[in-house]
Amino acid sequence: MVEKRNIFLIGPMGAGKSTIGRQLAQQLNMEFFDSDQEIERLTGADIGWVFDVEGEDGFRSREEKVINELTEKQGIVLATGGGSIKSRETRNRLSARGVVIYLDTTIEKQLVRTKRDKKRPLLQAKIPSREVLEALARERNPLYEEIADITIRANEQSAKVVAYHIISMLERN
């Protein structure tokens, strides 16, 4: 059985962090949090609005604060925003306060999973989504890899199967 330590999911948008996180929390009987949903709950506005009004820097500041507060809890599963790892403080907190699981996925899968989602501010630009996702991957993948304790390829399997694989890996560590 997996001890109740914090589990933090990182990775790009469309990797399945929220869906897999809910499955993990359910299977492990742990509390689930999504940093984007917490920001929306605290601001009373959706992420797109926060981006529009405060810009990416304002959003990242809120995100850093929310993740700091959530990672102080014990025995949680936390799905983080794809860009949360841009903050060194957030990377340090995630590494120090739990097991960091990097959900890696292909650009193709990201495109499929995000194409109808209008809540992704970084994909609302005039630049084609593929180019945006490729640029984000070049910038962020090294940061995900830097702090990951476990890396899982989250492409074809269901969230339930990926959660099962994560639990198996946690039991071995």
Curated annotation (Swiss-Prot):
Named cofactor requirement(s): Mg(2+)
Keywords per UniProt: Amino-acid biosynthesis, Aromatic amino acid biosynthesis, ATP-binding, Cytoplasm, Kinase, Magnesium, Metal-binding, Nucleotide-binding, Transferase
Gene Ontology terms, MF aspect: ATP binding; magnesium ion binding; shikimate kinase activity
Location within or outside the cell: Cytoplasm
GO BP, sorted A to Z: amino acid biosynthetic process; aromatic amino acid family biosynthetic process; chorismate biosynthetic process
Record note on cofactor: Binds 1 Mg(2+) ion per subunit.
GO cellular component terms, A-Z: cytosol
Annotated pathway: Metabolic intermediate biosynthesis; chorismate biosynthesis; chorismate from D-erythrose 4-phosphate and phosphoenolpyruvate: step 5/7
Catalyzed reactions: shikimate + ATP = 3-phosphoshikimate + ADP + H(+)
InterPro entries: P-loop_NTPase, Shikimate/glucono_kinase, Shikimate_kinase/TSH1, Shikimate_kinase_CS
Pfam families given in the database record: SKI
UniProt: substrate binding residues: D36, R60, G82, R140
EC number(s) given by UniProt: 2.7.1.71
Binding site for Mg(2+): S18
Annotated ATP binding sites: G14, A15, G16, K17, S18, T19, R120, Q157
Similarity annotation: Belongs to the shikimate kinase family.
Biological role: Catalyzes the specific phosphorylation of the 3-hydroxyl group of shikimic acid using ATP as a cosubstrate.
PANTHER family xref list: SHIKIMATE KINASE, SHIKIMATE KINASE 1, CHLOROPLASTIC
Oligomer and partners: Monomer.
UniProt name for this protein: Shikimate kinase
Source organism of this protein record: Baumannia cicadellinicola subsp. Homalodisca coagulata
The gene coding this protein: aroK
